[in-house]
Amino acid sequence: RICPRILMECSSDSDCLAECICLEQDGFCG
């Protein structure tokens, strides 16, 4: 996965950029 290292709050993977996934544990993309 190619994920920009930008901390974005998320509630689902679609909130994240590129190939990021939403890390439900901390509520941020990663």
From Swiss-Prot:
PROSITE patterns in UniProt: SQUASH_INHIBITOR
Instruction: List, in alphabetical order, the Gene Ontology terms for molecular function in this entry.
Output: serine-type endopeptidase inhibitor activity
Q: Does the keyword Disulfide bond apply?
A: yes
Q: Where is this site: Reactive bond?
A: R5, I6
Location within or outside the cell: Secreted
Function statement: Inhibits trypsin.
Spell out the protein name for this chain. Answer: Trypsin inhibitor 2
Upper classification of the organism: Eukaryota, Viridiplantae, Streptophyta, Embryophyta, Tracheophyta
